[in-house]
């Protein structure tokens, strides 16, 4: 089952995305979610199928959410996934001896 999907990014939260069926646009997205998400900014369109790999989402869950509720919300990664960790020697460089 292939789906043509539009993906929108949130202006309020970095790396938060909303997947919707292109044919339905934002029709089935709850109003309170849209208020929290901010004005959706179209990022791109994508053909989704069970064989397709997504970098941070389970394709089967995305397709199921699109079918059942009309949208899929991709949350930003946990903070520790994108914070660059510095080596211990750099963290202690300015410590008093």
UniProtKB/Swiss-Prot annotation:
- Report the protein name in the record: YcgL domain-containing protein PFL_1496
Tell me which InterPro entries the record gives: YcgL-like_sf (IPR038068), YcgL_dom (IPR027354)
Span of the signal peptide: none
Instruction: Please list the residue ranges annotated as the YcgL domain.
Output: 3-87
